[in-house]
Amino acid sequence: LSAPPKLTLKTMANLATKWSWGIGMLGAKRRGFGNIVGHVKGISDTSSLGSWTAEQFDPSLDWDKIAKLKEQWGGKVILKGILDAEDAKMALKVGADAIIVSNHGGRQLDGALSSIRVLPSILEAVGDQIDVHLDSGIRSGQDVLKAMAMGAKGTYIGRAYIYGLGAMGEAGVTSALNIIHRELDTTMALCGETNVEDLGRHNLLVPKDFEGRWQEYVGAGNA
């Protein structure tokens, strides 16, 4: 996956067999990132967008730079992408105000640990010294309840509202959020709870080896 796409002989030969699709695309509106192209200085097409995007990533980013960013910013800093207890401790050490336990969505590796499976070890590592939130896999109100009952202070969604956006635009996003809210409300009622602050492990049936199995596997892999 690259931008702009590179035309090869194989690609061109493949396109030649899709001539009807090609004709249709000639009359279609050119697609791009509407919130960037035309709004960010110097970004006018896919090619310049690709170069600009590459410039936004700093491969030398480390914990010391996050601490300096916190100092220069002067506001609250929330770190997303924490999937390990040691990283959670480092986030606390460099001054993060909150962390989001989150995996990478499959864009870097084909697989990763689920965020809710590592949540207990992260909470144990940092306690209540820092707010711990969670995303990755939140698709329903029941998912929200599970995460908060496990100890997360809050949850985030992405794909859930994107589905609504794709189907019905702004109204679809509102509908998706309302559905999740109703599901959470219903699940809480069936659990006998009226306040999210009262949610806890007593609302869940968590297997004793829920976390232990992956820790054992990781330990064996590092031996």
Question: Across the structure, where does each feature detected by a protein language model lie?
Answer:
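Alpha/beta catalytic cores of nucleotide-metabolism and tRNA/nucleoside-modifying enzymes
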Residues: 32, 117-135, 139-223
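Short beta->alpha connector loops at strand-helix junctions that form conserved
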Residues: 80-81, 102-103, 136, 158-159
